[in-house]
């Protein structure tokens, strides 16, 4: 098709995407999913000429995030967990917790709470274990490793004792080393850019529901370049069988 026709399709893909700042490679992949075949460099050229390129982020020297370096070949071998903060309009500060699969990038657990103690930090882990291992009982997740930082909630006896009970091996990240918590940190950055920085929530419960909806969309539509532009749900389905739909009624929302 002509450049003009392809540009129309590129703009349509960008408008339809629920994610901010996707680069030309993902736009090209989404065009392919629509049956539109073209070269990635052509998509890049048109996006550049018409001001459609994703913002380019240059990290400051000394930034030791290592996104994507601690990846696994199979799902449910290693998860990463981390937290961030946001502000609700009626209830003030809220804490957001995530758990992310290091193979597929799937948001396996997500939670919001007023506080940031070790019990709140455990919530996305409980969600994910119940969903992907079939329940909460001793040793059920014995083949899983959990990457986390050195925050007091994650290093507390209660947190460490609980994941040990579940059979999960603790893997604290080390500062200024490639074995960082970059996978979870990258997921939180995407969450901020596409939800926390662009929407307002009145209450923590409203935020929690918004996070669940975001996770459903993310797992179903976010494209993973390393896996040939497949979604987290597709990656899991290929490895372990068809995954049930992520719904608010699911255990994750409990």
Model-derived segments and their meaning:
Residues 57-61, 142, 146-150, 164-183, ...:
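RNase H-like polynucleotidyl transferase catalytic core
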Residues 19, 33, 71-73, 88-90, ...:
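Conserved, non-catalytic sequence blocks in retroelement Pol enzymes and Pol-derived host proteins
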Residues 1-78, 177-178, 231-240:
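Basic, flexible linker segments flanking DNA-binding modules
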Residues 20, 136-142:
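Short helix-terminating capping/connector loops at secondary-structure junctions
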Residues 157, 164-168, 190-254:
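C-terminal domain-tail junction helix/linker
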Residues 10, 27, 43, 82, ...:
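Mobile genetic element proteins and their domesticated derivatives, centered on retroelements
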Residues 88, 92, 110-137:
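Active-site beta-loop-alpha junctions of metal-dependent nucleic acid enzymes
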Residues 80-108, 114-116:
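An active-site-proximal beta-strand-loop segment
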């Amino acid at each position: 098709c002509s450049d003009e026709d392809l540009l129309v399709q590129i703009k349509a893909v960008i408008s339809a995407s629920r994610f901010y700042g996707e680069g030309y490679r993902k736009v090209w992949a989404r065009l392919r999913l629509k049956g539109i075949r073209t070269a990635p460099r052509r998509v890049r050229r048109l996006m550049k000429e018409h001001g459609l390129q994703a913002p380019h982020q240059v990290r400051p020297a000394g930034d030791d995030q290592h996104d994507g370096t601690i990846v696994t070949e199979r799902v449910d071998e290693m998860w990463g967990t981390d937290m961030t903060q946001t502000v609700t309009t009626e209830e003030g500060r809220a804490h957001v917790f995530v758990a992310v699969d290091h193979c597929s990038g799937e948001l396996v657990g997500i939670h919001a709470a007023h506080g940031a103690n070790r019990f709140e930090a455990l919530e996305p882990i409980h969600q994910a274990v119940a969903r992907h291992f079939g329940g909460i009982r001793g040793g059920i997740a014995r083949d899983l490793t959990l990457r986390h930082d050195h925050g007091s909630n994650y290093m507390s006896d209660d947190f460490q004792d609980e994941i040990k009970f579940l059979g999960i091996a603790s893997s604290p990240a080390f500062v200024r080393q490639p074995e960082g918590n970059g996978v979870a940190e990258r997921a939180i950055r995407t969450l901020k850019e596409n939800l926390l920085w662009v929407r307002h929530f009145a209450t923590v419960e409203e935020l929690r529901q918004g996070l669940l909806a975001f996770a459903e969309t993310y797992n179903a539509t976010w494209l993973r370049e390393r896996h040939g532009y497949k979604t987290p749900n597709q990656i899991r389905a290929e490895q372990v069988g068809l995954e049930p739909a992520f719904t608010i009624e699911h255990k994750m929302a409990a």
